[in-house]
Amino acid sequence: MRYFYDTEFIEDGHTIELISIGVVAEDGREYYAVSTEFDPERAGSWVRTHVLPKLPPPASQLWRSRQQIRLDLEEFLRIDGTDSIELWAWVGAYDHVALCQLWGPMTALPPTVPRFTRELRQLWEDRGCPRMPPRPRDVHDALVDARDQLRRFRLITSTDDAGRGAAR
């Protein structure tokens, strides 16, 4: 199963602190959560302007501990299932680190969770940079961005048998 995801985070060149994560499965399921453990005081001006205002109110049940987000993702990704898990993100290096850190060190990742994220931006370039529709108006909301990544994947791979050859 392919999973398209995005994270919002605070980074200072030394650490990456998860703010929120959105994941969209190819079968239409969606997951979104905001970490109760990030420190908004550490956010730079860009994150304060473009990310924090888009978060749900702190009383929302979408705000969850990192431990609960990890448990939710284990269920959402069906880590005990038989389908292989493919993670996809647009320029996903920091997203992958933010995701993996939910389990602690990378060695603590469940065996079925990939140690890498497939790069949607690279796939787009490899396919000749096909024209994409404009980004949604509410970008930098992790779930909105994850939905947009699935849409982009489908557009990029629409000529190769419904995307089955995307990872070649």
UniProtKB/Swiss-Prot annotation:
Mg(2+) binds at D6. One of its GO terms (molecular function) is 3'-5' exonuclease activity. Residues 6-9 are annotated as: RNA binding. Inhibited by EDTA. Its EC number is 3.1.13.-. Its cofactor is Mg(2+). Pfam families: Rv2179c-like (PF16473). It is an enzyme of class 3 (hydrolase). Keywords: Exonuclease, Hydrolase, Magnesium, Metal-binding, Nuclease. Homodimer. This is 3'-5' exoribonuclease Rv2179c. The lineage of its organism: Bacteria, Bacillati, Actinomycetota, Actinomycetes, Mycobacteriales.
